[in-house]
């Protein structure tokens, strides 16, 4: 009997292996296509109109043109052989090509993602409901904001919209990559639907919320393709500094012949161009765009859609994170943990009335009460409750329950609300109600009072569980210098207990949507950058106010439009990872800038002695690397300058590994690795290249 099971398991494993192999082959093919496209684009980007957007590499391209032209003209210096100019020009050409390749490779990954998204945009038809009630079939491209559309099982949702009638399971795997369908229903925070997703059960009526070209997928395609990419403030500032350095060195090199003529010797133009290229920060200049694009790409791969690079950078500078308790810090499913009778009541009486109040309650809390009572074998009359009239929970009453046919009113709800309700009917309150409610709150639970007419029977202890690992994650944020603030509608005692268990720095209890804005503004007034998550329409003002607002894809259209990031997986805890990606982007840019400027030191020791040794023999003392000859020294410095760019492309694309630590510790670590390393590596690299070049000169 065991043999068929073994064979079946083996076949399943083989099919899984084949599936993995197919995925690997497809990934390799896609990578080859991206590289091939990037190589073509690196040549196309040689267009001066494109190159001028990167002033540093534009100067290198001008140097290539000058030395290329000089290679066909008679040499003005007897010490410079004819092949030198063409060699320098070719090295400069490859320097520019390598920089273009880095940028094109980063853009190519975005294009591949965009192509994948475009596949989800199929030519579908929509069943539009006219004002007179007639249903007309039109193309999805003809839909306009405000149109009402009926989508049935098996049909594609034609455009972004909000459910106004019905409930259905929707397959959003084309957008989120998550195979499990999600429930979409009219009203509430889960009414938003995305064009290109599939209704897999039931039927819904939606109102279209976007015009053609403005849908969520259209925005995603535009962003990942880079069409809407703008340089971030930090990127512009760094680019300005690097351009200023380039301009200063350009002035130095242009005026240098005046001084050398005064000293009685001349420097060949190709040597001056080589000096300029070695002086300016070409390494970071060639990788700067790729770093920014790759940072956006990493966020997208994490299934987060950033509306701009500025949002990703801001995430890296965040000082405070505002987090909802429910669903972010805790699982959000408050379950019945125990029953506490009050006065002279028994647990059986509490369980009986708690169950009757919950029979028609479809909330997770209501279901958990029924499960708990049944698990304790407490008897109750289910038919009695089913024949009654259900009273749903409302924010105004903070209670739910059932009105039985005989006029009996059964309620469960917030302590204060139920006590007030009982007192309004002339009832008396047992002395131990508040005492036991406080005990539940101190333990991090939520107390619900169970009452029948003017009599309180006891309390239901609802407990929400903190997600595992949250304390460690908050400790990591604390090491980064980031403060965490938990916002919750719970009472202060419950909030304090959860905050202590989770390890957050501060909490705001009995928090309303407008309170979140106040918290954000208070932090911003202190000069801090604030991040928060949200999914409801009531979160939209706070998401718009925050420096980084992460909206859930399952949330409302208002929330997604107010935020500058959207999490396609609808996982609020992902804000912590987004902050890490932002810091990684900033750290990668800073580390490679440090490395680029530091490795110029070695190039100075290579090229400056080579320029002046013939005229000023004493300059030979600066040739500490003992390079073969002046010409090999210049060529070696230029070759290293070019080769280091493609060698650093993987690091620029992947990003430097980020470990939570203080800013001072991080600065010291990076200065040691990329500052000192940026000095040592070129000395070794140039010396090795010189030994090889010396064999041919």
UniProtKB/Swiss-Prot annotation:
Residues bound to Mg(2+): 535, 539
CDD domains per the UniProt record, alphabetical: P-type_ATPase_K (cd02078)
Coiled coil region boundaries: none
Enzyme superclass (EC): translocase
Residues that hold ATP according to the record: 361, 365, 393-400, 412
Known catalytic reactions: K(+)(out) + ATP + H2O = K(+)(in) + ADP + phosphate + H(+)
Pfam families: E1-E2_ATPase, Hydrolase
GO MF terms held by the record: ATP binding; ATP hydrolysis activity; magnesium ion binding; P-type potassium transmembrane transporter activity
Broad class of the protein's primary localization: membrane
Ranges annotated as spanning the membrane: 55-75, 79-99, 245-265, 271-291, 605-625, 633-653, 677-697
Keywords, sorted A to Z: ATP-binding, Cell membrane, Ion transport, Magnesium, Membrane, Metal-binding, Nucleotide-binding, Phosphoprotein, Potassium, Potassium transport, Translocase, Transmembrane, Transmembrane helix, Transport
Keyword Nucleotide-binding assigned: yes
EC number: 7.2.2.6
Gene3D superfamilies, per the entry: Calcium-transporting ATPase, cytoplasmic domain N (3.40.1110.10), Calcium-transporting ATPase, cytoplasmic transduction domain A (2.70.150.10), HAD superfamily/HAD-like (3.40.50.1000)
GO cellular component, as recorded: plasma membrane
Membrane topology: Multi-pass membrane protein
NCBIfam families the UniProt entry points to: ATPase_P-type, kdpB
Protein function: Part of the high-affinity ATP-driven potassium transport (or Kdp) system, which catalyzes the hydrolysis of ATP coupled with the electrogenic transport of potassium into the cytoplasm. This subunit is responsible for energy coupling to the transport system and for the release of the potassium ions to the cytoplasm.
Xref: PANTHER family: POTASSIUM-TRANSPORTING ATPASE ATP-BINDING SUBUNIT (PTHR43743:SF1)
Family recorded in the similarity comment: Belongs to the cation transport ATPase (P-type) (TC 3.A.3) family. Type IA subfamily.
The protein's name: Potassium-transporting ATPase ATP-binding subunit
Source species of the chain: Bacillus cereus (strain B4264)
Highest classification ranks of the organism: Bacteria, Bacillati, Bacillota, Bacilli, Bacillales
């Amino acid at each position: 009997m065991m043999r068929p099971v073994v064979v079946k398991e083996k076949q399943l494993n083989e099919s899984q292996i084949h599936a993995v192999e197919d995925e690997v082959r497809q990934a390799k093919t896609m990578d080859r296509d991206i590289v091939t496209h990037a190589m073509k684009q690196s040549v196309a980007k040689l267009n001066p109109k494109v190159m001028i957007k990167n002033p540093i590499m534009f100067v290198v391209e001008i140097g290539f043109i000058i030395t290329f032209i000089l290679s066909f003209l008679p040499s003005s210096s007897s010490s410079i052989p004819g092949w030198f100019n063409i060699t320098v020009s070719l090295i400069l050409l490859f320097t520019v090509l390598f920089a273009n390749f880095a940028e094109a490779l980063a853009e190519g990954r975005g294009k591949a993602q965009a192509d994948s998204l475009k596949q989800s945009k199929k030519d579908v038809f929509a069943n539009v409901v006219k004002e007179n009630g007639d249903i007309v079939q039109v193309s999805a491209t003809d839909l306009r904001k405000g149109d009402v559309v009926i989508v049935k099982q098996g049909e594609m949702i034609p455009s972004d919209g909000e459910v106004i009638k019905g409930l259905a399971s929707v397959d959003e795997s084309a957008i989120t990559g998550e195979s499990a369908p999600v429930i979409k229903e009219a009203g509430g925070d889960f009414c938003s639907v995305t064009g290109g997703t599939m209704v897999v059960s039931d039927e819904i009526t939606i109102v279209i919320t976007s015009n053609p070209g403005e849908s969520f997928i259209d925005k995603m395609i535009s962003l990942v393709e880079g069409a809407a990419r703008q340089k971030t403030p930090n990127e512009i500032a760094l680019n300005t500094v690097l351009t200023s350095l380039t301009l200063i060195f350009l002035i130095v090199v242009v005026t240098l012949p005046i001084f050398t003529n005064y000293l009685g010797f001349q420097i060949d133009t190709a040597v001056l161009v080589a000096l300029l290229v070695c002086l300016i920060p070409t390494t970071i200049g060639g990788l700067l765009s790729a770093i920014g694009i790759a940072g956006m790409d990493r966020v997208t791969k994490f299934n987060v859609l950033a509306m701009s690079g500025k949002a990703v950078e801001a995430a890296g500078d965040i000082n405070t994170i505002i987090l909802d308790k429910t669903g972010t810090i805790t699982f959000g499913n408050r379950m019945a943990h125990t029953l506490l009778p009050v006065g002279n009541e028994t647990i059986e009486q509490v369980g009986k009335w708690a169950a009757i109040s919950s029979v028609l309650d479809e909330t997770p809390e209501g279901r958990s009460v029924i499960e708990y009572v049944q698990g304790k074998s407490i008897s109750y009359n289910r038919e009695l409750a089913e024949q009654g009239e259900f009273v749903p929970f409302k924010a105004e009453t903070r209670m739910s329950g059932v009105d039985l046919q005989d006029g009996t009113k059964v309620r469960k709800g917030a302590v204060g609300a139920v006590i007030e309700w009982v007192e309004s009917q002339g009832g008396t309150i047992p002395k131990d109600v508040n005492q036991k409610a406080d005990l539940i709150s101190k333990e991090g639970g939520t107390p619900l009072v169970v009452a029948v007419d003017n009599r309180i029977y006891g309390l239901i202890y609802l407990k929400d569980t903190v997600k595992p690992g949250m304390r460690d994650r908050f400790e990591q944020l604390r090491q980064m210098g980031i403060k965490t603030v938990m916002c919750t509608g719970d009472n202060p005692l419950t909030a304090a207990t959860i905050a202590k268990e989770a390890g957050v720095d501060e909490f705001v209890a009995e928090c309303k949507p407008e309170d979140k804005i106040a918290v954000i503004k208070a932090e911003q007034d202190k000069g801090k950058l604030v991040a928060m998550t949200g999914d409801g329409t009531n979160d939209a003002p706070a998401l718009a106010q925050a420096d980084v607002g992460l909206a859930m894809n399952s949330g409302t259209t208002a929330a997604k439009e107010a935020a500058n990031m959207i999490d396609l997986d609808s996982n609020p805890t992902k804000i912590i990872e987004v902050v890490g990606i932002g810091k990684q982007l900033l750290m990668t840019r800073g580390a490679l800038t440090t490395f680029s400027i530091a490795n110029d030191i070695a190039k100075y020791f290579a090229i400056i002695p080579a320029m002046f040794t013939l005229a000023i023999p004493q300059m030979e003392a600066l040739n500490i690397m003992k390079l073969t000859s002046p010409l090999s020294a210049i060529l070696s410095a230029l070759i290293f300058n070019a080769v280091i760019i493609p060698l650093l492309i993987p690091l620029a694309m992947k990003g430097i590994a980020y470990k939570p630590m203080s800013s001072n510790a991080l600065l010291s670590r990076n200065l040691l690795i990329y500052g000192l390393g940026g000095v040592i590596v070129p000395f070794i690299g140039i010396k090795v290249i010189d030994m090889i070049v010396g064999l041919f000169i």
